[in-house]
Amino acid sequence: MTLEHVDTDYHLEHFLTGPLLPDREYLYRRTSDVMVETVAELPPGRVVDVGSGASQELARLAQLGWGAYAVDPSPHMLGISQMTREETKATVHLVRAIGERLPFANASVDMVACQGALDHFADRGAFMREAARVVRPSGRVVISLHNFEGLATRLGRLLHPLARASRLHHCAEWPCWQIPPDHTFKGDWPTVRGLGGPWLQLERAYGVSLFCQVYGWGHLLRRLPNGLAEGLLRRADRVAYGRPSWSDVIVSVWRPVDAAAASS
């Protein structure tokens, strides 16, 4: 598989559509924090972020002592990573490549991260195989994936007929249960549990955020005092953490199968 087989023209505009209401802002912020916190559980080493986007998480990890590598097939997104690198003064190495064919040696990476990008890949199984190949036996693979069968999507489908008949229909710029056309598969809890195939074993998983983009929720939060809105979002997030099947985003942590067998 080569760059010719994938979309290499991805832009931020493809992702950041519509107004950034408090529920979406919290989801992005909290997912970023959880990814950084999960990687930072290991001693600093070499971290590769595949589908790295703007590389904001990598910049934070580089400042914590990690050797940070941003991998993305899109020249535009690598340009955004370059801007992040210049703004933060962090050492982040930029690599143009695809997740299905990582340009790293076997067992040469301590952590492989993939935040909100796997459902854009042409072949998710090929990526998981590559991640297992390049990660050390003591390393981990951390993936965040949008959950299209969480509480938000279920409520969205339930409320949609009412929303269409009322002024609430304008409150969601994209119905939260509809899979965007640039996604290659539907993310949900059963799919996440099966991602590892024969290469990686699921170590743990947790959820991030509840109710993001449910009709009217973000607009209601925007009208509340900031402290109250933040408190509601945090309470919902605490519930989501222990119930990934309910959550808006699922974060999963994987270990190589051989390492998992050795420790059992």
What are these regions (language model features)?
Residues 54-101:
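Class I SAM-dependent methyltransferase SAM/SAH-binding core
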Residues 125-137:
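A short glycine-rich, Lys/Arg-flanked "PGG" loop and its adjoining helix->strand segment in the class I
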Residues 174-191:
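Acceptor-substrate binding/catalytic loop of class I
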